[in-house]
Regions:
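N-terminal glycine-rich phosphate-binding loop for ADP-containing cofactors
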Residues: 1-225
Length: 225
Protein backbone atom coordinates (compact mmCIF):
# COMPACT_ATOMS: atom_id res chain seq x y z
CA UNK A 1 0.00 0.00 0.00
CA UNK A 2 1.63 3.23 -1.20
CA UNK A 3 0.60 6.89 -1.14
CA UNK A 4 -0.95 6.66 -4.60
CA UNK A 5 -2.70 3.30 -4.22
CA UNK A 6 -6.41 3.54 -4.94
CA UNK A 7 -8.71 2.14 -2.28
CA UNK A 8 -10.91 0.36 -4.82
CA UNK A 9 -7.85 -1.46 -6.19
CA UNK A 10 -6.92 -2.64 -2.69
CA UNK A 11 -10.51 -3.69 -2.01
CA UNK A 12 -10.70 -5.64 -5.27
CA UNK A 13 -7.52 -7.63 -4.73
CA UNK A 14 -8.34 -8.23 -1.07
CA UNK A 15 -11.73 -9.63 -2.01
CA UNK A 16 -10.33 -11.67 -4.92
CA UNK A 17 -7.52 -13.16 -2.84
CA UNK A 18 -9.88 -14.08 -0.04
CA UNK A 19 -12.86 -15.43 -2.00
CA UNK A 20 -11.26 -16.98 -5.08
CA UNK A 21 -7.77 -17.92 -3.91
CA UNK A 22 -8.65 -18.80 -0.33
CA UNK A 23 -5.81 -16.68 1.02
CA UNK A 24 -5.62 -14.46 4.06
CA UNK A 25 -5.00 -10.96 2.71
CA UNK A 26 -2.88 -8.59 4.76
CA UNK A 27 -2.48 -4.99 3.65
CA UNK A 28 1.12 -3.87 4.07
CA UNK A 29 2.78 -0.56 3.42
CA UNK A 30 5.27 -0.23 0.56
CA UNK A 31 8.44 -0.76 2.59
CA UNK A 32 11.51 -3.00 2.03
CA UNK A 33 10.70 -6.70 2.59
CA UNK A 34 7.10 -5.76 3.51
CA UNK A 35 5.94 -7.48 6.74
CA UNK A 36 6.89 -11.16 6.74
CA UNK A 37 10.50 -10.85 5.66
CA UNK A 38 11.19 -7.65 7.59
CA UNK A 39 10.12 -9.30 10.84
CA UNK A 40 11.26 -12.82 9.97
CA UNK A 41 14.76 -11.82 8.91
CA UNK A 42 15.18 -9.58 11.96
CA UNK A 43 14.10 -12.47 14.16
CA UNK A 44 16.61 -14.94 12.76
CA UNK A 45 19.43 -12.39 12.52
CA UNK A 46 18.87 -11.41 16.13
CA UNK A 47 18.92 -15.09 17.04
CA UNK A 48 22.21 -15.61 15.17
CA UNK A 49 23.87 -12.86 17.19
CA UNK A 50 22.41 -14.12 20.49
CA UNK A 51 23.48 -17.69 19.81
CA UNK A 52 27.09 -16.63 19.49
CA UNK A 53 26.93 -14.53 22.65
CA UNK A 54 25.36 -17.38 24.64
CA UNK A 55 27.69 -19.98 23.07
CA UNK A 56 24.79 -22.22 22.10
CA UNK A 57 24.88 -25.15 19.72
CA UNK A 58 22.81 -25.85 16.62
CA UNK A 59 21.07 -28.72 18.44
CA UNK A 60 20.22 -26.55 21.44
CA UNK A 61 18.68 -23.81 19.33
CA UNK A 62 16.61 -26.20 17.23
CA UNK A 63 15.42 -27.95 20.38
CA UNK A 64 14.24 -24.62 21.80
CA UNK A 65 12.67 -23.22 18.62
CA UNK A 66 10.69 -26.20 17.33
CA UNK A 67 7.48 -27.92 18.50
CA UNK A 68 8.01 -26.86 22.13
CA UNK A 69 6.96 -23.32 21.12
CA UNK A 70 4.44 -24.43 18.50
CA UNK A 71 6.75 -24.29 15.50
CA UNK A 72 7.63 -27.07 13.00
CA UNK A 73 10.26 -29.72 13.78
CA UNK A 74 12.61 -28.01 11.31
CA UNK A 75 12.87 -25.22 13.91
CA UNK A 76 15.57 -22.66 13.01
CA UNK A 77 18.70 -24.10 11.48
CA UNK A 78 17.05 -26.94 9.58
CA UNK A 79 14.63 -24.41 8.10
CA UNK A 80 17.56 -22.25 6.96
CA UNK A 81 19.11 -25.32 5.31
CA UNK A 82 15.89 -25.98 3.41
CA UNK A 83 15.35 -22.37 2.34
CA UNK A 84 19.02 -21.80 1.52
CA UNK A 85 21.47 -19.63 3.42
CA UNK A 86 22.10 -17.55 0.29
CA UNK A 87 18.41 -16.62 0.11
CA UNK A 88 18.38 -15.49 3.73
CA UNK A 89 21.59 -13.49 3.26
CA UNK A 90 20.24 -11.82 0.11
CA UNK A 91 17.14 -10.57 1.93
CA UNK A 92 19.11 -9.51 5.03
CA UNK A 93 21.55 -7.51 2.91
CA UNK A 94 18.65 -5.89 1.06
CA UNK A 95 17.04 -4.73 4.31
CA UNK A 96 20.38 -3.48 5.60
CA UNK A 97 20.91 -1.46 2.42
CA UNK A 98 17.41 -0.06 2.03
CA UNK A 99 16.54 0.59 5.70
CA UNK A 100 19.47 2.77 6.82
CA UNK A 101 17.36 4.55 9.46
CA UNK A 102 16.19 1.35 11.16
CA UNK A 103 17.05 1.76 14.85
CA UNK A 104 18.25 -1.89 14.90
CA UNK A 105 20.22 -1.58 11.67
CA UNK A 106 23.23 -3.39 13.16
CA UNK A 107 21.23 -6.60 13.61
CA UNK A 108 21.11 -7.05 9.84
CA UNK A 109 24.92 -7.17 9.69
CA UNK A 110 25.86 -10.80 9.07
CA UNK A 111 27.71 -12.57 11.90
CA UNK A 112 31.17 -13.81 10.97
CA UNK A 113 30.16 -17.48 11.00
CA UNK A 114 27.44 -16.78 8.41
CA UNK A 115 29.92 -14.94 6.18
CA UNK A 116 32.35 -17.86 6.51
CA UNK A 117 29.65 -20.36 5.57
CA UNK A 118 28.78 -18.31 2.50
CA UNK A 119 32.42 -18.25 1.41
CA UNK A 120 32.65 -22.02 1.88
CA UNK A 121 29.42 -22.54 -0.13
CA UNK A 122 27.68 -24.19 2.81
CA UNK A 123 24.25 -23.06 1.72
CA UNK A 124 22.16 -25.94 3.03
CA UNK A 125 20.31 -28.68 1.17
CA UNK A 126 21.10 -27.24 -2.25
CA UNK A 127 24.85 -27.75 -1.74
CA UNK A 128 24.66 -30.83 0.48
CA UNK A 129 25.88 -29.11 3.61
CA UNK A 130 24.84 -26.23 5.79
CA UNK A 131 24.11 -26.33 9.49
CA UNK A 132 23.55 -30.04 8.98
CA UNK A 133 25.31 -32.53 6.71
CA UNK A 134 24.24 -36.04 5.78
CA UNK A 135 27.09 -38.54 5.38
CA UNK A 136 27.45 -42.26 4.70
CA UNK A 137 29.18 -44.32 7.35
CA UNK A 138 31.45 -47.29 6.68
CA UNK A 139 28.64 -49.73 7.41
CA UNK A 140 26.48 -48.12 4.73
CA UNK A 141 24.12 -46.35 7.11
CA UNK A 142 23.59 -42.60 7.11
CA UNK A 143 24.35 -40.07 9.81
CA UNK A 144 23.33 -36.44 10.14
CA UNK A 145 26.27 -34.38 11.33
CA UNK A 146 25.92 -30.96 12.94
CA UNK A 147 28.00 -27.85 12.35
CA UNK A 148 30.01 -26.65 15.34
CA UNK A 149 29.48 -22.88 15.27
CA UNK A 150 32.81 -22.20 16.99
CA UNK A 151 35.09 -24.28 14.76
CA UNK A 152 32.85 -24.55 11.66
CA UNK A 153 33.60 -28.27 11.49
CA UNK A 154 31.05 -31.08 11.45
CA UNK A 155 30.58 -33.49 14.33
CA UNK A 156 28.09 -36.08 15.53
CA UNK A 157 24.90 -34.63 16.96
CA UNK A 158 24.63 -34.10 20.70
CA UNK A 159 21.37 -34.32 22.62
CA UNK A 160 20.20 -30.95 23.90
CA UNK A 161 18.85 -30.97 27.45
CA UNK A 162 17.54 -28.12 29.59
CA UNK A 163 15.94 -28.10 33.02
CA UNK A 164 13.37 -25.59 31.79
CA UNK A 165 12.20 -27.96 29.05
CA UNK A 166 11.69 -30.72 31.59
CA UNK A 167 9.32 -28.47 33.52
CA UNK A 168 7.07 -28.02 30.48
CA UNK A 169 6.59 -31.68 29.50
CA UNK A 170 3.19 -31.94 31.18
CA UNK A 171 1.93 -28.61 29.77
CA UNK A 172 -0.07 -29.14 26.57
CA UNK A 173 -1.14 -25.55 25.92
CA UNK A 174 1.56 -23.70 23.97
CA UNK A 175 0.75 -20.31 25.51
CA UNK A 176 0.99 -21.69 29.05
CA UNK A 177 4.16 -23.55 28.14
CA UNK A 178 5.75 -20.42 26.70
CA UNK A 179 5.27 -18.55 29.98
CA UNK A 180 7.17 -21.26 31.85
CA UNK A 181 9.92 -21.31 29.22
CA UNK A 182 10.47 -17.57 29.50
CA UNK A 183 10.65 -17.82 33.30
CA UNK A 184 13.41 -20.44 33.14
CA UNK A 185 16.50 -19.84 35.26
CA UNK A 186 18.88 -21.83 33.02
CA UNK A 187 20.40 -20.95 29.64
CA UNK A 188 17.15 -21.88 27.90
CA UNK A 189 15.22 -19.25 29.86
CA UNK A 190 17.94 -16.71 29.18
CA UNK A 191 17.74 -17.53 25.47
CA UNK A 192 13.96 -17.14 25.31
CA UNK A 193 13.96 -13.82 27.15
CA UNK A 194 16.74 -12.40 25.00
CA UNK A 195 15.44 -13.55 21.62
CA UNK A 196 11.74 -12.89 22.10
CA UNK A 197 12.24 -9.69 24.08
CA UNK A 198 14.29 -8.41 21.17
CA UNK A 199 11.68 -9.54 18.65
CA UNK A 200 8.65 -8.10 20.44
CA UNK A 201 10.36 -4.74 20.94
CA UNK A 202 11.25 -4.61 17.24
CA UNK A 203 7.70 -5.49 16.18
CA UNK A 204 6.33 -2.69 18.37
CA UNK A 205 8.62 -0.20 16.64
CA UNK A 206 7.42 -1.28 13.17
CA UNK A 207 3.74 -0.47 13.79
CA UNK A 208 2.90 2.53 11.64
CA UNK A 209 5.88 1.90 9.37
CA UNK A 210 5.24 -1.47 7.73
CA UNK A 211 1.52 -1.69 8.52
CA UNK A 212 -1.11 0.03 10.65
CA UNK A 213 -1.66 -2.38 13.54
CA UNK A 214 0.10 -5.16 15.41
CA UNK A 215 -2.73 -7.51 14.41
CA UNK A 216 -1.74 -7.26 10.74
CA UNK A 217 1.81 -8.21 11.66
CA UNK A 218 0.45 -11.26 13.48
CA UNK A 219 -1.72 -12.13 10.47
CA UNK A 220 1.21 -11.83 8.05
CA UNK A 221 3.49 -13.98 10.18
CA UNK A 222 0.84 -16.67 10.69
CA UNK A 223 -0.25 -16.76 7.05
CA UNK A 224 3.24 -16.49 5.61
CA UNK A 225 5.08 -18.94 7.82
Amino acid sequence: LGPYTKKDVVDFFSDYGSRFLGKRVVVARDTPAFIGNRIGIFSIQSLFHRVKALKMTVEEVDKLTGPVIGRPKSATFRTVDVVGLDTLVHVANGIKEHCPDDERHEVFQLPSFIEDMMQQNRLGSKTGEGFYKKVKKEDGSSEILTLDLETLTYRSAKKAQFETLEKTKAISDVADRFKVLCDGTDKAGQFYRAVFGDLFAYVAQRIGEITDTVYKIDDAMKAGF
